[in-house]
Design a protein with these regions (language model features):
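Substrate-positioning beta->alpha
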Residues: 172-178, 192-214, 221-225
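N-terminal Rossmann NAD(P)H-binding glycine-rich loop of SDR-like oxidoreductase domains
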Residues: 3-23
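Short alpha-helix in the Rossmann-fold core of NAD(P)-dependent oxidoreductases
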Residues: 84-91, 107, 139-140, 199
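NAD(P)H-binding glycine-rich loop region in Rossmannoid oxidoreductase-like domains
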Residues: 47-93, 97
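Mid/C-terminal beta-alpha module of Rossmann-like enzyme folds, strongest
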Residues: 212-271, 302-316
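Conserved C-terminal active-site "lid" loop/helix of NAD(P)H-dependent oxidoreductases
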Residues: 203, 239, 261-293, 303
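Catalytic helix-loop patch of NAD(P)-dependent Rossmann-fold dehydrogenases
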Residues: 85, 120-167
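Conserved Rossmann-fold NAD(P)-dependent oxidoreductase catalytic core, especially the SDR/UDP-sugar
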Residues: 93-135
Length: 316
């Protein structure tokens, strides 16, 4: 049984390929730069957005399932149209081809940004009304709609969207990578003012969720939400990274009000709101179908920093 995986060279995709191989699946990689990664059985060119339909259909020959995790993210030079083309239109074209040619399931890896902005505070589940606040979130929501519509129009119900909170692991980018760099500082940090709490998930746990959704015996639901068992405070995340770097906590009890005023003054008010927002994902639906949320979030973050520190020391 063969699974087509897009985005397989990314830090999440690599874990998915590894988990699929360990479970006995053959893996076909679709990539814009078709170089065979470890443990892939074959590699094909990922067609461009304007490629003919036959190019997308050809990718699906011999494929049972499709896992689409390729995406445009954290690209400050990209326009709204760029995000929409890659995360929306291309996703829709893949889904239409898979609905026509692949016999199994289609999983689209999405993000909680498809439903809430970075400054949203509250609980998030599958029923959360989508209100994306940035180009990335709007494009991921568009990809969700196109995926489910493609399968619905083909009379099929074996496609699902898997929404993810921030994902950690080797090669991560975005806010978690920024926090890890910030934690690797000898200076005291005003973490007492960073009152936000976040649900996180590891790349390995994402891969385990993908494997479960591909193999579970019952039909797919259209939307799933993943996340670790326990959310982590921003201050705990930074402390875990510092522990991994071998640095003392060195937290400074700066009140939140002056920090908020300074952030607003320098045009960083939205970023400050994100650091103080609480976003808690409820993965109970996915857990009820056999996936097990991880419980050692902070230990994994510390180990991630420890490995980064070790590599940096060896490179010196």
């Amino acid at each position: 049984m063969k699974v087509l995986v897009t985005g397989a060279t990314g830090f999440i995709g690599r874990q998915i390929v590894s988990h699929l191989n360990d479970a006995g699946f053959e893996v076909r990689i679709a990539s814009r730069r078709p170089v065979r990664p470890e443990r892939a059985d074959d590699v094909v060119q990922l067609p461009g957005i304007d490629a003919p339909a036959d190019a997308f259909l050809a990718m699906m020959d011999g494929v049972t399932h499709v896992v689409h995790c390729a995406a445009l993210n954290n690209d400050h030079g990209a326009s709204e149209a760029d995000y929409m083309a890659v995360n929306g239109v291309l996703t829709g074209r893949l889904a239409h081809a898979a609905a026509a040619r692949a016999s199994g399931r289609f999983l689209y890896l999405s993000s909680i940004r498809a439903v809430v902005g970075s400054d949203f505070s509250g609980a998030i589940d599958e029923a959360t009304v989508p209100a994306p606040q940035d180009a990335y979130g709007r494009s991921k929501r568009d990809g969700e709609i196109r995926t489910l519509d493609a399968y619905r129009s083909a009379g099929r119900s074996d496609a699902a969207v898997l929404r993810l909170p921030p994902v950690h692991g080797e090669g991560m980018k975005g806010n978690l990578a920024t926090l890890m760099r910030l934690a690797d500082s000898a200076l005291p940090l005003p973490t007492a003012a960073l009152t936000g709490t976040r649900s996180l998930i590891s790349a390995s746990a994402v891969a385990a969720a993908v494997l479960r959704l591909l193999t579970k015996p019952t039909p797919l639901r259209p939307i799933y939400l993943a996340g670790d068992r326990r959310p982590a405070a921003i201050s705990e995340i930074i402390a875990a990274f510092r522990r991994g770097f071998g640095r003392p906590p060195r937290r400074v009890a700066v009140p939140a009000a002056p920090m908020r005023m300074a952030a607003t003054l320098f045009g960083k008010g939205r970023a400050w709101q994100a650091l103080t927002a609480t976003q808690i994902c409820d993965p109970s639906l996915l857990a009820s179908e056999g996936w097990v949320p991880e419980t050692d979030t902070l230990e994994q973050l510390a180990e991630l920093a420890r490995r980064n520190h070790s590599r940096a020391a060896q490179a010196r």
